[in-house]
């Protein structure tokens, strides 16, 4: 089984209005991809290669202040024509060790060109409450990845385990400035543009990520339906390399999470309850605050009704965050200002015809 794909795309990105933090950017992309699936002895082999040629045309505006207060600010616009050529490869070996157990090993080298926002942002972004500053000198991000996965199924029981390690050269991330940098910008009279917003810069450093995803469960057949119970957990740790300028953790890492789900379904009725235990996140980057853990409990019940031969209605009841936990999402830029929603309960009515 072989496939060849070609893709040509052009994108014009323009942010206008009060939140105009980036000048218009034109991007042109040309992609060639090849995919192969074959047998190699006892292994199923999947191989893919992708070549991208990306051009981004944009500009960055900067206001210059005259010493005389009566003079208007002069805006200087610098134009950029940036080109990136990337190559990505991936190969996966899979084998059925038994009738119930499948094991796979995947290796990949993935190159990613910087996005338009990472290159050309230069202004207040209200969603993140940051004054974001891109960098037109960012280079291609290169990731070397290894993934090992096991999947098991037998008589209603199922389990999966996935472990991965990623070494990323020139990892691109958005980092809040330090207090010292903030004071320096204040001295440069940039406070007028930042206001109360935190200045954040797009930077690059080598980083390493290691993590896992685990899931185990069972589906039980009952007289009138099926009951499925599952337990899962995931975790990831990302650190900048020891030889990088910053040896701290990568910002906004997802904390360790444990999931428990109980679901029942029949021909016209379904119900479920889920528990999500999110651990505290103390593995933080410089200038980043830690986040406390929390437990979320959600439930849902749905019933289907036949109103006529061709018309059906589904009535759903949902309740989210039943314990009314005060929870904050560590991966959010505004976690300290905006917590997750508290307890909310409601009904949904869906009619199909």
Locate each region found by the language model.
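Outer-membrane beta-barrel strand-turn architecture
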Residues: 1, 37-44, 95-99, 142, ...
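Residues on the lipid-exposed face of transmembrane beta-strands in outer-membrane beta-barrel proteins
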Residues: 1, 32-38, 91-95, 138, ...
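Face-selective signature of the C-terminal outer-membrane beta-barrel domain
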Residues: 1-72, 76-96, 102-104, 108, ...
């Amino acid at each position: 089984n072989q496939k060849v794909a070609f893709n040509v795309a052009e994108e014009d990105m323009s942010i206008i209005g009060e939140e105009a933090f980036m000048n218009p950017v034109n991007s042109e992309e040309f992609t060639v991809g090849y995919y192969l699936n074959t047998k190699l002895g006892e292994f199923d082999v999947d191989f893919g290669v992708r070549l991208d040629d990306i051009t981004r045309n944009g500009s960055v505006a900067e206001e210059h202040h005259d010493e005389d207060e009566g003079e208007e600010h002069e805006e200087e616009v610098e134009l950029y024509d940036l080109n990136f050529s990337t190559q990505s490869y991936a190969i996966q070996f899979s084998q059925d060790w038994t009738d119930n157990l499948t094991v796979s090993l995947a290796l990949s080298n993935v190159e990613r060109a910087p996005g338009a926002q990472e290159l050309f942002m230069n202004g207040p972004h209200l969603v993140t409450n940051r004054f974001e500053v891109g960098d037109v000198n960012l280079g291609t991000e290169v990731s070397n990845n290894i993934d090992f996965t096991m999947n098991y199924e037998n008589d209603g029981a199922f389990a999966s385990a996935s472990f991965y390690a990623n070494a990323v050269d020139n990892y691109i991330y958005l980092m809040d400035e330090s207090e010292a940098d903030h004071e320096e910008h204040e001295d440069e009279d940039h406070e007028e543009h930042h206001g109360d917003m935190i200045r954040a810069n797009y930077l690059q450093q080598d980083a390493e990520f290691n993590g896992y995803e685990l899931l185990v469960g069972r589906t039980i057949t009952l007289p009138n339906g099926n009951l499925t119970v599952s337990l899962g957990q995931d975790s990831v740790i990302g650190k900048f390399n020891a030889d990088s300028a910053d040896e701290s953790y990568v910002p906004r890492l997802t904390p360790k999470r444990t999931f428990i789900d109980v679901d029942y379904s029949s021909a016209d009725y379904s119900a479920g309850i889920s528990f999500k235990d999110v651990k505290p996140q103390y593995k933080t980057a410089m200038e980043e605050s830690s986040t406390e853990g929390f437990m979320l409990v959600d439930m849902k019940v749905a019933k289907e009704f036949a109103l006529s031969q061709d018309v059906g209605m589904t009535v759903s009841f949902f309740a989210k965050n039943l314990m009314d936990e005060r929870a904050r999402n560590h991966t959010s830029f505004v976690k300290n200002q905006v917590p997750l929603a508290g307890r909310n309960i409601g009904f949904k009515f869906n009619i199909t015809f």
